[in-house]
A protein has these predicted regions:
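Loop-to-helix transition at the N-terminal end of transmembrane alpha-helices
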Residues: 44-59
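Helix-adjacent hinge/juxtasegments
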Residues: 69-100
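Transmembrane helix-loop-helix
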Residues: 98-118
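Interfacial loop-to-transmembrane junctions
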Residues: 126-148
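The first (N-terminal) embedded transmembrane alpha-helix
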Residues: 15-37, 144-151
Length: 168
């Protein structure tokens, strides 16, 4: 196998540390989604769903930071500015979803699901274009599906939302 082939194989394989940390990052999503739905304590349930939304907002902000880091190495000024701009959106959307959570949980969860979907697609595009390692796109698509599933689970486990599409 040539050095070029070895390098390509390395770029396709998700580094074990990235995979393990990505999967570990799902624990709060699923733990809070389930716990908030099964606790009989209404006050605790409200605090847990708030923690869930805040965690989602933090993760969105983290993902935006990845884009910011990639933008710093861009040589094309237009591309750099576009990537900087797009990378700020996740933290703003996460903040808005956290703020809205108090007033309208279905809308907040919907915003978060859409934000994670769009961020996952953006990250996949970064990898497909060669601006990020190929493995990053693969990892992000898998984690995006898992996070959106956790958002759906949190929705379904809310007693007041179970079996409804919610009201936006």
């Amino acid at each position: 196998m040539s050095d070029k082939d070895t390098g390509m194989a390395q770029e396709l394989k998700i580094p074990p540390s990235a995979l393990m940390l990505g999967l570990a990052g799902l624990i709060p999503f699923y733990g809070l989604a389930i716990w908030q739905g099964i606790t009989p304590d209404e006050l605790l349930s409200e605090r847990l769903i708030t923690a869930f939304v805040l965690y989602a907002a933090c993760i969105l902000s983290f993902l935006g930071g990845v884009g910011w880091g990639l933008a710093m190495s861009e040589t094309d000024q237009l591309q750099r500015g576009l990537t900087f701009g797009i990378s700020t959106a996740p933290s703003l959307v996460g903040w808005a979803a956290a703020f809205i959570n108090v007033q309208n949980l279905p809308f907040s969860l919907s915003i978060l699901a859409m934000a994670f979907l769009l961020q996952g697609l953006w990250d996949w595009r970064l990898a497909a274009s060669g601006r990020a390692p190929h493995w990053f796109g693969t990892l992000r698509i898998g984690l995006t599906i898992a996070v959106i599933s956790a958002l759906a689970l949190a929705w379904m486990m809310r007693p007041e939302l179970a079996g409804t599409s919610g009201s936006l």
